Structures are given as C-alpha cells and as structure tokens.
Design a protein with these regions (language model features):
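Cysteine-nucleophile active-site neighborhood
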Residues: 44-117, 121
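Structural motif
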Residues: 36-40, 72, 167-169
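Catalytic metal-binding/acid-base residues of hydrolase active sites
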Residues: 22, 77-79, 101, 134, ...
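A short acidic, often aromatic-flanked loop/helix-cap motif at beta-alpha or helix-coil junctions
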Residues: 26-31, 103-104, 134
Length: 199
C-alpha cells in the first residue's frame, strides 16, 4: 500500500489526476485503461493462484508491456514476470513477460540493500528478504549492488529493467524510500499517454 500511496501523492502534488483500481481474481482486466501496473508479492501459494489468473490474460499483459506499458513488480511479483519459478515443490510457470527465471536455493538473502541505478541519480535503498535467486541473463539490471545481495547473491546486480518494466526485490516500501524511482514511473506513464512528461 505504501507504493500506491506514494504514486498517488506525488501525482496529486503535481496536479495530475489519478485513481487506484484494485483487482480481485474474478475481475476482468482491461490493460487499455491502465497507466501503471503494480504487481506485489505474497506466499508461494498466493503467487500460484495469482499467476494462474494472469496466465489467462497473458497475451494482453504481454502486449501492454511491449507497448511500453509501465509496470513495477516487487518481490513475488518480480518472480512472476519471468519464465518460471522453481521451488522444492516443483516448477511454477511464469508470465514470460521478461526473459528471466528464478530458482529457490538454500538460505534467504535478508539485509538492507543499496543500489546505483542508471534510471535515477540518487542511490536506491531498500530491504531484501527472498529465498529465490533470479537470473536475468543479458537483460538490464535495475541497479548495481553497492551493499547487500541482489538478485542471486553472486552477480552484483539487483532487479531487472525491460522497456518500462521494473522488477525488484526491494521492499521499504520501495517508492516512498526512493521518490526518484516513483517519479521515473510517473514520467514514463505520462510520456506513453501524452507523448511528453514535464515533472
């Protein structure tokens, strides 16, 4: 909720009219009416339920992403963006919106984390707590890890950026702690909708 509140407040301060739409499993989702999609996390079981629902509209979601739709996906939502998430119980197919994958490994990566991201001038800060290790291949990371573990505890990078999609393990909440990232999302949404953004 903190990420949503931050987006709404920073729009309000600039006189940008915005509304929040919360979707339940039974709801129809029309991506043509959405400017920013927030995909949060949950337990593995909850993720599986949500993923099954989103798989039904995967083609529409993929079209939204490829048309520069803005998405911020945190923790479990980040894992869902990819091709699959392998746990000790089996393999959960992802939404295949970004060419990444996640595998559960022994031990959790828990700590404060600091990144340097190409998207914003200031360092990005947050808190990470994840058992999954995400591998992003040749994709652009959200940032280089200055302190903490990041995607897999080895690569030195955290998160992924694809077009106007950010996937990340950073809690905090992310956007209130990093208003520049919040403004980046708003600016991309305005550019997509109106062709320009003056923040």
């Amino acid at each position: 909720r903190g990420n949503i509140a931050c987006l709404m407040q920073r729009c309000k301060w600039r006189g940008i009219e915005a509304e929040t739409i919360e979707f339940e499993l039974k709801d129809e989702i029309d991506f043509a009416k959405l400017d920013i999609v927030l995909l949060g996390g949950g337990s593995d079981r909850e993720q599986m339920i949500v993923c099954q629902k989103l798989k039904e509209i995967q083609k529409d979601f993929k079209a939204y992403v490829e048309d520069n739709g803005v998405v911020i996906a945190v923790c479990g939502g980040y894992q869902l963006l990819g091709n699959y998430y392998k746990t000790e119980d089996g393999v959960m197919e992802g939404l295949e919106l970004v060419d990444i994958y996640t595998e559960q490994e022994e031990g959790r990566l828990i700590d404060n984390i600091v990144l340097q991201s190409e998207l914003v001038a200031m360092p990005v800060v947050g808190f990470e707590n994840h058992g999954g290790r995400t591998y992003i291949g040749e994709n652009q990371p959200f940032g280089k890890v200055l302190y903490g573990s990041g995607n897999d505890g080895k690569s030195g990078y955290e998160g992924v950026v694809y077009k106007n999609v950010i996937g990340t393990y950073l809690h905090g909440p992310l956007l209130p702690k990093n208003p520049q990232v919040c403004d980046w999302l708003i600016a991309r949404a305005l550019e997509r909708k109106y062709g320009e953004a003056d923040l």
